[in-house]
């Protein structure tokens, strides 16, 4: 198992299943060992990591610095530090599971760690690599123009009625989107085919995967592509928008409803109203603070630790931690309608990224 082999790289805390039997004892042991170690630096693509690192430092009396950094920059930093033998990054939270697996785990530049005491609350699918949160991306509509979502099936987005009226980030510049395509093909193709038959009354009449057929048809329907979630959300639900669009955005954009936006989630969309994408927590091989790094990952897996990101609709991988009632999108009550990413097949996503990008590029029409 990859996590166990890499755990031996830099472990100073003796661990066994019994070591995690008591919450307080396990955490006290980690904390005691961490007090003998240097301060840690943690990189994440969300600015909330700064707040989380400060709260961690205050709670445990340790020094941790949070740095906002996009996944490609963090990956490059860890790789260069490992190659130079000069480790400055201790923990990385990466919203790019395939790259994390291929460029850091499989090279030994970072390693996976999972706290055994959480085995009853974190599904096996989220343990190796360790997924801290799942970020929902949802199909949205303008609640000022429609009482309910104007579509009921994802295949409707490929039809003439919605030509140039679907908006989303450009998959050629957003790797998570093509990873989503590959995940659907690997784990959700039967559901995509069933949705096609439910909508049109007959099976899909070709031998290719239903997912690839949908991707090609969506690309050919001239969607409005943007370079950010914000632009996609504005196209759907800005205060002055008079045209009806369906958009794919993160749940974080629902914060803007407080400032006049009118985003709504397409509930009960067949087969899914959206999908999730993980943030993977890894420890840099060669860190001088392995115990503090583990304690920080554990902290992010607590309700207190993940609270700042939960406000944006990011869902803890712990089954016993719910989103706060104040989260603006309401996605917590709709989790069962999301297509859930499988981190265990992230390498397959990495290997097929170019193929899905090529498929999109060849079929896209403006």
Language model features with spans:
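Conserved C-terminal helix/tail region of periplasmic/extracytoplasmic solute-binding proteins
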Residues: 23, 340-366
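Short, polar/charged alpha-helical segment
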Residues: 26-35, 43-63
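A ligand-binding cleft/hinge motif common to bilobed small-molecule-binding domains
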Residues: 98-103, 237, 242-264
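Periplasmic-binding protein-like
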Residues: 121, 134-137, 209-218, 260-285
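Mature extracytoplasmic/periplasmic domains
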Residues: 275, 279-344
């Amino acid at each position: 198992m990859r996590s166990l082999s890499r755990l031996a790289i830099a472990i100073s805390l003796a661990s066994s299943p019994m070591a995690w039997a008591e919450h307080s004892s396990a955490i006290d042991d980690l904390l005691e060992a961490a007090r003998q170690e240097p301060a840690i630096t943690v990189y994440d693509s969300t600015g909330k990591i700064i707040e989380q690192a400060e709260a961690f430092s205050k709670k445990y009396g340790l020094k941790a610095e949070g740095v906002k950094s996009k996944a490609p920059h963090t990956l490059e930093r860890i790789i260069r530090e490992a190659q130079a033998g000069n480790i400055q990054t201790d923990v990385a939270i990466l919203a790019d599971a395939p790259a994390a697996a291929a460029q850091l785990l499989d090279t030994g530049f970072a390693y996976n760690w999972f706290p055994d005491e959480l085995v009853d609350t974190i599904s096996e699918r989220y343990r190796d690599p360790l997924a801290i949160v799942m970020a929902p991306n949802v199909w949205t509509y303008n609640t000022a123009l429609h009482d309910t979502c104007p579509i009921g099936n994802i295949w409707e987005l490929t039809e003439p009625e919605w030509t140039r009226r679907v908006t989303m980030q450009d998959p050629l510049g957003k790797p998570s989107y093509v990873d989503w395509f590959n995940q659907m093909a690997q784990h959700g193709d039967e559901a995509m085919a069933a949705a096609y038959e439910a909508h049109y009354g007959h099976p899909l009449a070709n031998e290719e995967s239903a997912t690839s057929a949908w991707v090609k048809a969506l690309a050919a329907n001239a969607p409005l592509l943007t370079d950010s979630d914000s632009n996609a959300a504005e196209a759907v639900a800005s205060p002055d928008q008079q045209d009806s669009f369906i958009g794919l955005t993160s749940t974080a954009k629902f914060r803007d409803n407080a400032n006049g936006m009118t985003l709504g989630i397409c509930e009960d969309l067949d087969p899914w109203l959206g999908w999730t994408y993980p943030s993977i927590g890894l420890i840099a091989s060669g860190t001088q603070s392995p115990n503090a790094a583990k304690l920080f990952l554990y902290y992010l897996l607590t309700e207190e630790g993940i609270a700042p990101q939960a406000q944006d609709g990011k869902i803890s991988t712990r089954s016993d931690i719910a989103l706060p009632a104040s989260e603006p999108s309401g996605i917590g009550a709709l989790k069962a309608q999301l297509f859930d990413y499988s981190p265990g097949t992230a390498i397959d996503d990495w290997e097929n990224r170019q193929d899905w990008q090529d498929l999109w590029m060849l079929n896209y029409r403006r």
